Amino acid sequence: MHEFNKGVTLIQLSSALAYSHALMNQVVNPGDHVIDATVGNGHDTVYLAKLVGTTGHVDGFDIQPAAIKATTSALDKAALSHQVTLWQTGHEHLADKIATDQPIKCAVFNLGYLPGGDKQIITKPTTTLTAVKAIQERLVTNGLIILLVYAGHPGGATEAQAVLDYATSLDQHQFQVLQYQFINQVHVPPYLLAIQKR
């Protein structure tokens, strides 16, 4: 029988959002080029801009003017606007905005609707997967695509299944895929998918 090691610190399980930030911390370095595929209210955009520093760059996408406005304000407040380009367009147009030979270290998606916004305007399976595939073509070795997947709103379960099916189908010799999810919560919390290029 093994004695419990009293020097081991037990961790508290983090939310999917907190875990996404932990993953970003591990993979993103100053000077990297990263993508916020759904800028929303700008929280992840600001977080990524801090990680890439003054020598890196963030490209952020959102179709909603309110999201671009909120993110611009958050970046201005944090004095990080100079290292971010915001595109008021859907992330499915990423391939038109980011050069094919531009290496991407990390990309983050918060699927669903804009918090505090119109719940009828949601991300869709076809556009999300178009963006994911465009990023995969530019992703560096050990680079990461992080998707926070929300299934509780109308249309969310369909998108969640499409994204999960796609991620599951990826060749394990080219990508490794992690699913991080709490399975006993009744309010359908988001889960995280992380796709890492080998």
PLM region spans:
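A short glycine-rich, Lys/Arg-flanked "PGG" loop and its adjoining helix->strand segment in the class I
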Residues: 127-141
